[in-house]
Design a protein with these regions (language model features):
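Phosphate-end processing signature that detects enzymes handling 5′-triphosphorylated RNA
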Residues: 1-201
């Protein structure tokens, strides 16, 4: 499944033991992400305005809404190289699409201050990337969205392939922090558990 493909997402919270049993069941039918056979850490930074516009849109069930998320990948052992993305998550009448552009991880700090980093403004950027930049101008520069929380978890992902329509992910070890630090791949410094008991988010 392509990363920017339109999708309908369903999320479930399972006890850790039940989640692992379900993961093994899915693994018997859908291939694991190539190159990440034993999983990978995900570090995310979510944006919102000072009056929590994105949060309240979700709570009120607004049919057409967007939010900004920065995300970095990479493993400390180097098996997955560092990579940074800025993403627009767009929900429309229950369907979701993710538009994203790659950029140097260190450029995310500039974006967090409300500025479009120069690497995103290069004329060689694709049409899709320029669309993302236009949305960042709208949501970050004009509307004033800034990072409000950073989240870390470990993911196992199973995907039906570029021509398929199914992707199942298992996220464990969910932790967060509200002091906005520079995003670093595989950063362990997330002191707050998202939930009291260990769960799997599917």
């Amino acid at each position: 499944m392509d990363a920017t493909q339109d999708r309908r997402e369903f999320k479930f919270l399972l006890p850790a033991e039940e989640g692992e049993k379900f993961r093994l069941f899915i693994a018997s039918m859908i291939p694991v992400d190539r190159g990440a056979e034993d999983g990978y850490p995900v570090i995310s930074e979510y944006y919102d305005t000072s009056d929590r516009h994105s949060y309240w849109q979700k709570q009120w069930g607004v049919a057409n809404r967007r939010r900004v998320r920065a995300r970095v990948y990479g493993r400390a052992d180097g098996l997955i190289p560092p990579a940074g993305f800025i993403e627009i998550k767009h929900k429309l009448d229950g369907d979701g699409v993710k538009r994203r552009a790659a950029l140097p991880i260190e450029s995310l700090a500039e974006l967090a201050q409300g500025k479009i980093p120069q690497p995103l403004l290069e004329p060689t950027r694709s049409r899709a990337d320029k669309h993302v930049v236009a949305e960042l101008q709208d949501l970050i520069v004009d509307a004033g969205a800034r990072p409000v929380v950073q989240v870390r978890y470990d993911r196992m992902a199973y995907d039906s392939g570029p021509e398929g329509t199914i992707r199942v992910t298992f996220d464990t070890g969910l932790r967060c922090r509200f002091d906005m630090k520079p995003l670093t791949p595989d950063d362990p410094d997330f002191p707050l558990a998202v939930v009291k008991h260990e769960i799997a988010v599917v």
